[in-house]
A protein has these predicted regions:
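General marker for long, soluble alpha-helical cores
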Residues: 1-179
Length: 179
């Protein structure tokens, strides 16, 4: 089967059955790690929403190809860069900075999404990565800062929502104890 056709089929299937798609991608990448970047780029080009799945599969099956693959995805599908950066920061924080820099070089227009993705995936490495990105491209510094700020707002909103759920559960327990 043509690798581009396989990538397109799997990228399309990722929305309906992500677990099966993940297994297929991991098997393909493990069988030929040298083609992982090309395969991931084909997936992202076919469906940018599949970038997170492709990135996770690469980290699991061919981690040495992860930086090259995320850059390749960003180059062909800049809309995929944020999701790829988020997964890299979450699952491979030691490689997050290098991957973000490679993605930024491949798709400078995605700098905000890349920085935001890193901040979403791992807030602990976000400042360091954003600083490296801004130093590499000072003209993108405002976009990079915006990406991190938006991600921080999302992270804070998620923490508030989780706290509200916990508080409601405690109120329900206390109310039940009183009755």
């Amino acid at each position: 089967m043509n690798p581009d056709a396989a990538a397109e089929i799997i990228a399309g299937a990722a929305a309906s059955n992500p677990d099966a798609a993940m297994e297929l991608v991991q098997d393909i990448m493990a069988s030929d790690p040298s083609s992982a970047a090309e395969f991931a780029a084909s997936m992202a080009e076919a469906n940018p929403a599949a970038a997170a799945l492709a990135t996770e599969a690469i980290i699991e099956a061919a981690p040495e190809q992860a930086i090259e693959a995320t850059a390749a995805m960003a180059e062909v599908a800049p809309a995929a860069a944020g999701a790829a950066a988020e997964v890299m920061a979450e699952l491979a924080p030691d490689q997050a900075g290098e991957a973000a820099m490679a993605m930024q070089e491949a798709a400078p227009e995605a700098a905000a999404a890349i920085a935001g993705g890193v901040a979403q995936g791992n807030p602990e490495v976000a400042a360091e990565v954003a600083t490296e990105m801004a130093a590499a491209d000072p003209e993108a510094a405002a976009d990079i800062a915006t990406g991190v700020a938006v991600a921080a707002q999302v992270n804070a909103a998620q923490e508030v929502a989780a706290a509200q759920v916990e508080a409601q559960a405690q109120v329900a327990d206390a109310t039940a104890d009183l009755q």
